[in-house]
Amino acid sequence: MFLRRFAGPLLGKVKETTGLVGLDVVPNAREVLISLYNDTLKAVETIPSSAEYRKAVEKFTKFRLQVCEEEKDWEKIEERINGGQVEELIVMAKDELMLIDKMKG
């Protein structure tokens, strides 16, 4: 009884499903996003600083990284970024990294 009453609120919320076919829950989504956003900012430095694409990517990636660093709760991250579920944000960040590679070449 003690654990349910007092420890329950201390535990982080656990997402059981994304509700999207083929998109599994990522239990450490915040950490994955922080890593991907840092990788994106590093990768986009290879694009000329005058390129509008680079400016846009840096702007939204810095914002999303800031949100992930400020918020510990995945629901708050989803709410503030307003770009879908954290798992969808991971897919988008991976896609952006692939696009940066294509933009370089």
Which positions does each model-derived feature cover?
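Short, charged early-sequence alpha-helical segments and their helix-coil boundaries
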Residues: 69-94
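Amphipathic alpha-helical coiled-coil segments
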Residues: 68-72, 99-104
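Short amphipathic alpha-helical coiled-coil/interface segments
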Residues: 61-65, 90-97
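N-terminal organelle transit peptides
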Residues: 1-51, 82-84, 98, 105
